[in-house]
Each structure stands twice: as structure tokens, then as C-alpha cells.
């Protein structure tokens, strides 16, 4: 399964990473890598939760 990850930089310099196909999967980070890692971890939790229910 492939999902799109969108990354933007906020005005305050933080990065935000979002998976549009998974509502609520949105994560901030001080760096792009940090935001991506947090969004990936959250996406995995959301997908695992969906499989359990």
C-alpha cells in the first residue's frame, strides 16, 4: 500500500507532514525529517487500529 505524504513549512519555521488519505494523520516537527517520522509513526498506528476493528 502506498500513501502520499505532503510536507509544508509553516511561517514559524516548523514543518508539517500530512497523509491526506488518512484523516487525522498530521504531525509537526522542528525538521522535515522529524515531521515525516512522526507522521509515518502515526499513520502506522491508524492503520493498525483499523485492522483491529
Regions found by a protein language model. Name each.
Residues 33-34:
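N-terminal amphipathic alpha-helical interaction or autoinhibitory segments
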